[in-house]
Amino acid sequence: MDLNTILIILGILALVALVAHGLWSNRREKSQYFENANTFGRANRQDEPISTPESYKQARNVAPAFTQPKQAVIHQEPPVQQPLNTEPEPITQETPVRAEPQSVDQIKITLPNVEPAPAESAPIYEMRPSRRNTEPQYYQQPSEPYYQQPVQQNLARQTIADIEATVDPNEGVNSSSEYLRTQLQEASQEGNQIFTQSPLSRAPLQQPIEFDQPAQQEKESDNNEDEDVSFVMLYVAAAENRQFQGTVLVQALEDLGFSLGEDNLYHRHLDLTVASPVLFSAANITQPGTFNPYTLHEFFTDGVAIFMRLPSPGNDRTNLKIMIRSAKTLAQQLGGFVLTEQQELFTDAAEEEYLAKIK
């Protein structure tokens, strides 16, 4: 026989032996499992008590623990046994008394260890006839309003202390009195006559009339400032058929040093702080010309106007160069154009003209 045939036969025998061994070991494990289960069942049956009819009845009578509510144990005295010969007492039914509403005056509050105060008797009022004359009295009312007649003295020649001493303090001096007006008019005429007759009145006045100079100077300075103030303006406009979005525009302005300030405009300060003076400002071209920080995500505009007030804090020419540089940078970042005040393209020639205006 060949060696290959011998090897094949040996392999087949080995497989048959393995299969037979596996079946035998499987059957053996099953038999052990059933034996263990039987022994475990017998042990449980031996541990359980044998139930009797009496125990079954007791189990039925006893309710589960969760169904019986726990009640508090109350110790009660045993009822008193009454003799049989005693007659039952008649049962009296109390009719409910209807509670009538009581007034506040009928409610009484008593305190312990305090004697009740004697009830105060209601006051008795007696109607006595009036001693006055019951007949009606008639008074003649003047047609004109009545005023206290002033003292027949010339009030114009009296001092303030004399007038206050003679006048009622509650009413004061009656300035509508014709008598007082007549006296004041006469006194003024006499004063004018004395002034015209006095030789001092003919002399020229040596002292000039003094006016409130600070107030007048302030008004003149304000007028001069209004006349001298001028503005330099540039426009940063979006491309045709395009607009600047609010958040993008504000971010570009803040990158250039602008900050939201007075009148809801963006201002460029001298030291980049709010406390420093404003060099130039940026306003919205679209009405009302301001920036609402709460609606920037919905905000679109055609452009902004950058303007500087002259004279400005510091060097006007240097500030104008900073403004021109800021406008060019803003237009480059947003993809727009810089325009002059006449809304023309801001070229190098226009820049030289702007700088030439500033001395």
Swiss-Prot record:
GO terms for biological process: division septum assembly; FtsZ-dependent cytokinesis. Residues 78-101 are annotated as: Disordered. One of its GO terms (cellular component) is cell division site. Keywords: Cell cycle, Cell division, Cell inner membrane, Cell membrane, Membrane, Transmembrane, Transmembrane helix. Residues 26-359 are cytoplasmic. Residues 1-4 are periplasmic. The chain crosses the membrane at residues 5-25. It is a single-pass type I membrane protein. It is found in: Cell inner membrane. It comes from the Bacteria. Essential cell division protein that stabilizes the FtsZ protofilaments by cross-linking them and that serves as a cytoplasmic membrane anchor for the Z ring. Also required for the recruitment to the septal ring of downstream cell division proteins. Belongs to the ZipA family. Interacts with FtsZ via their C-terminal domains. This is Cell division protein ZipA. It comes from Mannheimia succiniciproducens (strain KCTC 0769BP / MBEL55E). The lineage of its organism: Bacteria, Pseudomonadati, Pseudomonadota, Gammaproteobacteria, Pasteurellales. The gene is zipA.
